[in-house]
Amino acid sequence: MRSDRVKAGFERAPHRSLMRATGMTDEDLSRPFIAICNSFNEVIPGHVHLNRVAALIKEEVRKAGGTPVEFNLPGVCDGIAMGHGGMKFSLASRELIADSVETMLSAHAFDAMICIPNCDKIVPGMIMGALRCNIPTIFCSGGPMAAGMAEDGTVLDLNSVFEAVARFKAGKINEEELHSLECRACPGAGSCSGMFTANSMNCLSEVIGLALPGNGSLLATSEERKEFWKQTARRAVEMAKADGPLPRDIVTRDAIDNAFTIDMAMGGSSNTVLHTLAIAREAGVEYDLQRINDISRRTPNICKVAPSSRFHMQDVLRAGGVSAIIHEIARIPGALHLDAMTVSGKTLGETVEGCGIADETVIHPLENAYSRDGGLAILFGNLAEEGAVVKKAGVHPNMMSFRGPAVIFESQEEACEGILAGKVKSGDVVVIRNEGPKGGPGMQEMLAPTSYIMGQGLGAEVALITDGRFSGATHGACIGHISPEAAEGGLIGLLRNGDIIEYSIPDRTLNVCLSEEEIARRRADWKPTYNRVSSSWLSRYRQLATNASKGAVLRRGE
């Protein structure tokens, strides 16, 4: 066993003495050690129940013949961090989590690991750490939250409240109505109920092969979820005894292709591009944005979930879950690598046998796809020489191609103030810059400004571009991850108010209408602009972060 490195032989008597101090017995020491990598905290609704999840899993691990050893990692609630300086720490926390997993696994010898994440950066951070250490690892998320419900029966989620803020500011609803939405949108434990970043990544963990079927859609509070957690615990002990499969056996180029294919089919969050690129890097897989575009062009979008439709994860579950989406896309010859291995010990194709669509209003058959290409698109042009990302599944049909004058804001906070003050009009292109990985630093999400645009009724009349990123709850003509970012000399940093910006999502282009001579003149006068930051951690992140086209990961030292 891998754990013999810290528990076998007379030389390890001191080590065993310390383990006995934690309550371990001779029997415990004789069994495989199963790391329970938990992200429980009382801050995030998606994580508030994970202490109970871990307790259930540990009990099942013991029954299966393993010795569970739990440790915890930090986690940021993007919703609570939204709209203020706390959001600068969100993406950076992914690297912190990956480093923490690596630290705990490297310092202590485990035979296998069960990861219990749920929300945005915690999922990819744990995957990245698992890939570095490459011991048998299985993921089981905390599960999605049920959708809320308004007094009139309207289905709600967190985004409903963000958009209600703008409606309240505009005088369209009163304070009592806003308070009612606030109290009803998030009814209990679980990751926010739409196809936002957390649920997108939990679905993709299943597709990549690191989690058992059901990981993405079984509701957090359901009895089925409890059985799923138990099943995961039993499988982890089997993997420990077999010493496999290992994360790097599973996360291959084929698995990353599969992830992006299903991402396109289900209209996942634009953040999945950042995170899956980062995961590929840790797996030693070279992967570029053009490959993602190629997958998008050949993959139909067959499922739209909030914020792109009225449906939520509970509806996806009712319709057959992620397995039904995989099964339907597998009808396209060559669309998926069905022989890719998963933690179940079966191939991806074997795990979805017989998993048809149960509700075709939620998951469409291929013949009735929302579009013939995928829910995400990568744009290129003079404004995005290294790429930009748009969640096209959430863009109004009138906004698939657009041309308009730039209204420039130097930060998210400035943009929020300007939008609420009425500085943005129909036909404008909002530009929010200096919010990239380096410029922010931290690449803030832009849910507040995009929600304010929607709340003012401008969602089909205004576009927004940024070197920052968006919440998975964002919808509308919102183009993010512009690379190179302003802080590294990207053209977005040279724009002026009134410059004409045009994009075409079908053609995958994003440009500003300036001559090469004018661009050269502006560049000659350009000086890098960085938002000031007092945080030691964010200062280090700024120094080491790559841009979004490379996953905003930290550069490694030699």
Curated annotation (Swiss-Prot):
<feature type="binding site" description="via carbamate group">
    <location>
        <position position="121"/>
    </location>
    <ligand>
        <name>Mg(2+)</name>
    </ligand>
</feature>
<feature type="binding site">
    <location>
        <position position="120"/>
    </location>
    <ligand>
        <name>Mg(2+)</name>
    </ligand>
</feature>
<keyword id="KW-0460">Magnesium</keyword>
<feature type="binding site">
    <location>
        <position position="192"/>
    </location>
    <ligand>
        <name>[2Fe-2S] cluster</name>
    </ligand>
</feature>
<protein>
    <recommendedName>
        <fullName>Dihydroxy-acid dehydratase</fullName>
        <ecNumber>4.2.1.9</ecNumber>
    </recommendedName>
</protein>
<keyword id="KW-0479">Metal-binding</keyword>
<comment type="similarity">
    <text>Belongs to the IlvD/Edd family.</text>
</comment>
<dbReference type="GO" id="GO:0009097">
    <property type="term" value="P:isoleucine biosynthetic process"/>
</dbReference>
<dbReference type="GO" id="GO:0009099">
    <property type="term" value="P:L-valine biosynthetic process"/>
</dbReference>
<dbReference type="InterPro" id="IPR004404">
    <property type="entry name" value="DihydroxyA_deHydtase"/>
</dbReference>
<feature type="binding site">
    <location>
        <position position="445"/>
    </location>
    <ligand>
        <name>Mg(2+)</name>
    </ligand>
</feature>
<comment type="pathway">
    <text>Amino-acid biosynthesis; L-isoleucine biosynthesis; L-isoleucine from 2-oxobutanoate: step 3/4.</text>
</comment>
<comment type="function">
    <text>Functions in the biosynthesis of branched-chain amino acids. Catalyzes the dehydration of (2R,3R)-2,3-dihydroxy-3-methylpentanoate (2,3-dihydroxy-3-methylvalerate) into 2-oxo-3-methylpentanoate (2-oxo-3-methylvalerate) and of (2R)-2,3-dihydroxy-3-methylbutanoate (2,3-dihydroxyisovalerate) into 2-oxo-3-methylbutanoate (2-oxoisovalerate), the penultimate precursor to L-isoleucine and L-valine, respectively.</text>
</comment>
<feature type="active site" description="Proton acceptor">
    <location>
        <position position="471"/>
    </location>
</feature>
<dbReference type="GO" id="GO:0004160">
    <property type="term" value="F:dihydroxy-acid dehydratase activity"/>
</dbReference>
<dbReference type="InterPro" id="IPR042096">
    <property type="entry name" value="Dihydro-acid_dehy_C"/>
</dbReference>
<dbReference type="Pfam" id="PF00920">
    <property type="entry name" value="ILVD_EDD_N"/>
</dbReference>
<keyword id="KW-0001">2Fe-2S</keyword>
<dbReference type="GO" id="GO:0051537">
    <property type="term" value="F:2 iron, 2 sulfur cluster binding"/>
</dbReference>
<feature type="modified residue" description="N6-carboxylysine">
    <location>
        <position position="121"/>
    </location>
</feature>
<comment type="subunit">
    <text>Homodimer.</text>
</comment>
<keyword id="KW-0411">Iron-sulfur</keyword>
<keyword id="KW-0100">Branched-chain amino acid biosynthesis</keyword>
<dbReference type="InterPro" id="IPR037237">
    <property type="entry name" value="IlvD/EDD_N"/>
</dbReference>
<comment type="pathway">
    <text>Amino-acid biosynthesis; L-valine biosynthesis; L-valine from pyruvate: step 3/4.</text>
</comment>
<dbReference type="InterPro" id="IPR056740">
    <property type="entry name" value="ILV_EDD_C"/>
</dbReference>
<dbReference type="GO" id="GO:0005829">
    <property type="term" value="C:cytosol"/>
</dbReference>
<feature type="binding site">
    <location>
        <position position="78"/>
    </location>
    <ligand>
        <name>Mg(2+)</name>
    </ligand>
</feature>
<feature type="binding site">
    <location>
        <position position="119"/>
    </location>
    <ligand>
        <name>[2Fe-2S] cluster</name>
    </ligand>
</feature>
<dbReference type="GO" id="GO:0000287">
    <property type="term" value="F:magnesium ion binding"/>
</dbReference>
<keyword id="KW-0456">Lyase</keyword>
<dbReference type="InterPro" id="IPR000581">
    <property type="entry name" value="ILV_EDD_N"/>
</dbReference>
<keyword id="KW-0028">Amino-acid biosynthesis</keyword>
<dbReference type="InterPro" id="IPR020558">
    <property type="entry name" value="DiOHA_6PGluconate_deHydtase_CS"/>
</dbReference>
<keyword id="KW-0408">Iron</keyword>
<dbReference type="Pfam" id="PF24877">
    <property type="entry name" value="ILV_EDD_C"/>
</dbReference>
